[in-house]
């Protein structure tokens, strides 16, 4: 891929240190006010229970999918896989590319876990340099806590997914 660690592309202009430091300061907190739990939560719980009973003792992994390139550095609007939306209740506007829903086996059936790419931090340059996830490029994403409140699922960062899957 043509992206660096901070999400910038090889043809993006250099990021002077002064600009990077300036862009990290002075941002007001912008929590989402009045998050209402999704009306889909009761339906999702039933769907998860049925899926859990179908695969006892097995780990179930349902990816949301990724972005599809339209032309060069332009992507089509993201649409999560239908199975991901069905089992999480996450609607189009809240779906984040590369998210993964997992049913992890436990003594009670399964634990439902959602791995997402959370809102960009102001401690890095990602929020204004990363064309794939940066808030200036694609808009505000929900934090882990906001997603958990709205959809009633345990939420973790997608960056932790590989480590989670390797700890069988």
Regions found by a protein language model. Name each.
Residues 1-168:
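A composition/biophysics-driven feature that prefers long, compositionally simple stretches
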